[in-house]
UniProtKB/Swiss-Prot annotation:
Top-level taxon of origin: Bacteria
Protein family per UniProt: Belongs to the SecD/SecF family. SecF subfamily.
GO cellular component terms listed in the entry, alphabetical order: plasma membrane
PANTHER family: PROTEIN TRANSLOCASE SUBUNIT SECF, PROTEIN-EXPORT MEMBRANE PROTEIN SEC
Name the UniProt record assigns to this protein: Protein translocase subunit SecF
Gene giving rise to this polypeptide: secF
NCBIfam families noted in UniProt: 2A0604s01, transloc_SecF
InterPro entries listed in its UniProt record: SecD/SecF_arch_bac, SecD/SecF_bac, SecD/SecF_CS, SecD_SecF_C, SecD_SecF_C_bact, SecF_bac
Alphabetized Gene3D superfamilies for the sequence: Multidrug efflux transporter AcrB transmembrane domain (1.20.1640.10)
Membrane topology: Multi-pass membrane protein
Transmembrane segments: 17-37, 137-157, 158-178, 188-210, 250-270, 272-292
HAMAP family: SecF_B (MF_01464_B)
Localization of this protein: Cell inner membrane
Length: 314
């Protein structure tokens, strides 16, 4: 299904797109610089205890009980139903004995107050050294993914297309992380996996648009040569129905996961929900927009080469 009979001047909105992207990126960077990300114990190290009470507990009471035994810096929040509580406490030492002592202290302190009205549902521990290594490896995973993308698009198209795609992907990741920072959503290993998924999904949209742009750059001899902006607008319009269908159906599934999948998968679904929306926007208004601004130096020579060697268009 293609939109054959309509021409939508997307690049007419490029000034507004630049302003919107600049504002969103600035807000994201400021938020990450001031508030930071709410890293889970996967990256910071610590003990996690999930508790279920017979009656909805008061978080301030639980915090008061834990503060009395030196655990005042613990994070306490509802998880799932209003009868379930998640307690996260930092671990200073990498020794397994220290983790077990911390968990025992949490259980004994709360059991003394609530007795058989409380059940322990889940216990997790990650040492601070392991958490730091996971955070470092996660950062490298994103960087390696971006470098691999540049290499692939450089080989498949040209370097300027690869650079434009990576800038758009960095734009997507920064805005997604900024929304995470503003919302205070816990950043865990499943969320990191979702970030990498968003990078791949956004790149897929961008490649579809770039491929159509490259096809439309070739103008048979004797035909009037359209402007670069016109070529890009036409290319985006021709791929728009595909973008709407794929992004729309994926968003429906992700929205169902977010609203009905439960707390365990909530962060993963939230990342995909935000990332797909931002990625769809960037494939239209960011990656293609960079080609418009680079046209005198990069695109015009490419167009000239295609006129001389049309067989290079595959």
């Amino acid at each position: 299904m293609r939109l054959r009979f309509y021409y939508i001047p997307f690049m007419r909105l490029r000034t507004y797109a630049v302003a919107v992207s600049a504002i969103l990126v600035a807000i994201a960077l400021i938020s990450m610089g001031t508030r930071g990300l709410n890293f889970g114990i996967d990256f910071t190290g610590g003990a996690l205890v999930q508790l279920e009470f017979q009656q909805p507990p008061v978080i301030e009471e639980i915090r008061s009980h834990l503060s009395a035994v030196g655990l005042g810096d613990s994070t306490i929040q509802h998880f799932g139903s209003d009868r379930e509580i998640l307690v996260r406490a930092p671990i200073i030492s990498d020794e397994s004995a220290a983790a077990m002592e911390l968990i025992s202290l949490i259980r004994e302190t709360l059991s003394a107050q609530y007795g058989d009205q409380m059940d322990v549902l889940r216990i997790e521990t990650v040492g601070p050294r392991v958490g730091g290594e996971l955070r470092e490896q996660g950062t490298y995973a994103i960087l390696y993914a971006l470098l691999a993308i540049v290499a692939y698009i450089w080989w498949r198209y040209e370097l300027n297309f690869g650079v434009a795609a990576v800038i758009a992907l960095v734009h997507d990741v920064v805005i997604t992380l900024g929304i995470f920072s503003l919302a205070g959503v816990t950043f865990s290993l499943p969320v990191l996996a979702a970030i990498l998924t968003v990078i791949g999904y956004s790149l897929n949209d961008t490649i579809v648009v770039f491929d159509r742009i490259r096809e439309n750059l070739y103008i048979p001899e004797g035909k009037e040569k359209p402007s670069i902006i016109s070529i890009i607008n036409t290319s985006i319009t021709e791929t728009l129905s595909r973008t709407i269908l794929t992004s729309g159906t994926t968003l429906i599934v992700v929205a169902v996961l977010y609203f009905f999948g439960g707390e365990v998968i909530n962060g993963f679904a939230f990342t995909l929900l935000v990332g797909i929306i931002v990625g769809t926007y960037s494939s239209i208004f960011v990656a293609s927009l960079l080609l418009v601004y680079w046209r005198p130096r990069y695109i015009e020579p490419h167009l000239k080469k295609l006129q001389e060697k049309p067989e290079e268009v595959v």
